[in-house]
């Protein structure tokens, strides 16, 4: 029988519970055990008696996972002093999570240590570009990324991978552990997200090939919006067509909307499941979401990310008949029309630039088209905010997030100046400031709190990945 030596320590109920957690066997002098010569403690330390630790089976397991548990147990036992276990340290609880966003031509990544304070969690981030040209495929991209990570990890091992996925449809409404079957199902949803899901699936297969024993989790942008009622997600088209082609409102940016709404609720001292608010995610892609009881009940993007607000290069809402007119009279096909609506419209079409900073500067210099673009964009957002205030039964907060929402006080002012009818009042000095910290910019007497909260989708993905993996 193999006996494991452990350092003589004082044993308490917490120590015994720790051993039971790992399925180990305690042998004290009043239980039968093979004798083991242990160093004698000083007379003052002889009580209580030192137990001896035996493995649960006579023969030691060669299973590396069990060995890991024994080693981890031994380390934690050494931390017991004066009959009590020390508080678990960051070193004991660290979880290194790789967050990836695999696109068709790029691989964005970030490594986070979720045991550290939020400001210190991000260890590194980067981008591998030109996949399909200079970089042959996603497997090579993951190899390049892995080489870059080696000096950062410094011998530590990743413990999980979290993958961002744009479209989960009705199939995936929660973080999901990846298997070959799950990856294929994500790939099968490509008709709903042809620019994203095929690349996500390729990235997942490459990651699973590189780290076959590492838990990998998919986090879906659409999942947060799966709680929308049917009156919000169904389109008024024949049921057979809607069902045949899965045509409905899905919504996007869900990871950001959920994360920011949670931060807002915490800031205001409101239980997350009681929070009613409106989140405006304003970047090159933009969407606004109505949150009621902590859940998404409506959102501006629809079947694709094209619907809703005017964006950097996307048109947002448009009468479908205008599209059939363009198709027939211009003699173009659907693919060309899709390119026009997604890549040649929005601010770019109206003002000649998809960069909000340049559009604001042009408007301030007297450019009438730039001013019109700002007026149209803020007007469209104002309409959604006003409507969603009714949807949630009176918002407790309006939140601005993402690149424009966080950094453009000029655009926030354009929007907020339109919302006086809702009783919204804001502090112009606070609004003009730029800060990486979440903050309230409304006045004390504002009917609705106005917040600016930096989004952190990578943090949200890492936390969701950790939660699922720890439950395995």
Which sequence ranges carry the predicted segments?
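Short, Lys/Arg-enriched N-terminal segments with co-localized hydrophobic residues
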Residues: 78-94
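Short glycine-rich, Thr/Ser-proximal phosphate-binding strand/loop in the N-terminal lobe
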Residues: 97-136
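Short beta-strand-loop/turn "lid" adjacent to the catalytic site in phosphate-handling enzymes
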Residues: 149-197, 215-217, 223-235
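Glycine-rich phosphate-binding loop of actin/hexokinase-like ATP-binding domains
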Residues: 227-329
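Phosphate/ATP-binding catalytic cores across multiple sugar-kinase/actin-like superfamilies
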Residues: 260-264, 375-393
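A mobile "lid/hinge" subdomain adjacent to the ATP/sugar-phosphate binding pocket shared
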Residues: 329-373
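Conserved phosphate-binding/catalytic loops in two-lobed NTP-binding clefts
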Residues: 409, 413-457
């Amino acid at each position: 029988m193999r006996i494991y030596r452990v350092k003589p320590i004082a044993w308490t109920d917490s120590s015994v519970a720790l051993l039971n957690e790992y399925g180990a066997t305690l042998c004290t002098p009043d239980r039968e055990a093979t004798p083991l010569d242990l160093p004698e403690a000083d007379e003052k330390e002889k009580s209580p008696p030192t137990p001896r630790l035996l493995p649960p089976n006579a023969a030691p397991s060669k299973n590396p996972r069990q060995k890991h548990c024994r080693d981890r147990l031994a380390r934690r036992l050494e931390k017991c002093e004066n009959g009590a276990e020390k508080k678990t340290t960051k070193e004991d609880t660290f979880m290194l999570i790789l967050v990836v966003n695999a696109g068709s031509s790029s691989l964005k990544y970030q490594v986070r240590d979720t045991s550290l304070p939020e400001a210190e969690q991000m260890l590194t981030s980067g981008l591998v570009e030109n996949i399909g040209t200079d970089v042959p495929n996603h497997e090579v991209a993951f190899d390049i990324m892995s080489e870059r990570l080696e000096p950062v990890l410094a011998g530590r091992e990743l413990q999980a991978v979290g993958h961002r996925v744009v479209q989960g449809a009705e199939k995936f409404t929660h973080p999901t552990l990846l298997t070959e079957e799950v990856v294929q199902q994500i790939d099968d949803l490509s008709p709903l997200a042809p620019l994203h899901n095929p690349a996500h699936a390729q990235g997942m297969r490459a990651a699973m090939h590189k780290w076959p024993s590492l838990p990998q989790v998919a986090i879906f942008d659409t999942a947060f919006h799966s709680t929308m009622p049917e009156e919000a997600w169904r389109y008024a088209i024949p049921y057979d067509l809607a069902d045949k082609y899965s045509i409905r409102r899905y919504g996007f940016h869900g990871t950001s909307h959920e994360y920011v709404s949670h931060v807002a609720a915490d800031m205001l001292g409101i239980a997350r499941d009681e929070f009613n608010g409106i989140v405006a995610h304003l970047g090159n892609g933009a969407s606004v979401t109505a949150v009621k009881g902590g859940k998404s009940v409506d959102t501006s993007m629809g079947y694709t990310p094209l619907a809703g607000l005017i964006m950097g290069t996307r048109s947002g809402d448009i009468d479908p008949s205008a599209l059939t007119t363009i198709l027939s009279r211009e003699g173009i096909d659907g693919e060309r029309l899709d390119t026009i609506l997604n890549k040649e419209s929005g601010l770019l079409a109206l003002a000649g630039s998809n960069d909000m900073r340049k559009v604001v500067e042009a408007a301030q210099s007297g450019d009438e088209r730039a001013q019109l673009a700002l007026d149209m964009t803020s007007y469209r957002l104002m309409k959604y905010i006003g409507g969603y205030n009714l949807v949630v039964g009176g918002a407790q907060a309006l939140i601005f997030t993402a690149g424009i929402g966080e950094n453009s006080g000029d655009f926030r002012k354009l929007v907020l100046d339109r919302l006086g009818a809702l009783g919204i009042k804001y502090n112009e000095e606070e609004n003009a400031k730029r800060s990486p910290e979440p903050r309230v910019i409304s006045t004390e007497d504002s009917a609705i709190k106005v917040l600016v909260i930096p989004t952190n989708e990578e943090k949200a993905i890492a936390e969701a990945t950790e939660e699922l993996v720890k439950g395995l």
